Amino acid sequence: MHPELDLVYVGKIVGTHGVKGELKVISLTDIENRFNELDRVYLVNEQDHYDPIIAHIESSFTHKNMEIVKFSEWDDINQVEGFHDWYIKIPREERPQLEEDEYYFDQITGLSVVTVEDEFLGTVTNIYQTGSNDVYEVSKEQDDKPILIPALYEVVKKIDLDEQIMIVDLPEGLLDEEE
């Protein structure tokens, strides 16, 4: 892959739809109608490490919890069948600007987590979307049992992307329950 490209995931191609070159895509973003807002994207095959292919979105719509995406470069099912399990990516700088105190998952994953008392808890290794609020999985070492921290204003006091740190004020008993 071109080292100068800093690409982020927006979708995964999981199959074809119809015979006119449309593809079924699982959206990897929670931005509604994301593919309608995009023009140029990069198709990436991470298994075979091909260079990204630039493609242009002609149209997209939602069907049975899938995005159906049509690229202007291809008009036939035979031309797109090989894209199964490829990813759709865009340059990081083309992501929409978020509101204050909103972050992309890749900005949170990897942050060091410390308490307001300056105790190091570990690193954010995963984020779970539970419906009511996200939950951050924090691990010190690979084999340690992770701590699950609710992504609530009462708990997460500060996120500093420049310093790569999250400061939390854990509810009483949370660490005791996790151990």
Curated annotation (Swiss-Prot):
Keywords: Chaperone, Cytoplasm, Ribosome biogenesis, rRNA processing. It comes from the Bacteria. One of its GO terms (molecular function) is ribosome binding. InterPro entries: PRC_barrel-like_sf, PRC_RimM, RimM, RimM_N, RimM_N_sf, Transl_B-barrel_sf. GO terms for biological process: ribosomal small subunit biogenesis; rRNA processing. Residues 99-174 form the PRC barrel domain. GO terms for cellular component: cytoplasm; ribosome. The keyword Cytoplasm applies. It is found in: Cytoplasm. Binds ribosomal protein uS19. An accessory protein needed during the final step in the assembly of 30S ribosomal subunit, possibly for assembly of the head region. Essential for efficient processing of 16S rRNA. May be needed both before and after RbfA during the maturation of 16S rRNA. It has affinity for free ribosomal 30S subunits but not for 70S ribosomes. The PRC barrel domain binds ribosomal protein uS19. Belongs to the RimM family. This is Ribosome maturation factor RimM. It comes from Natranaerobius thermophilus (strain ATCC BAA-1301 / DSM 18059 / JW/NM-WN-LF).
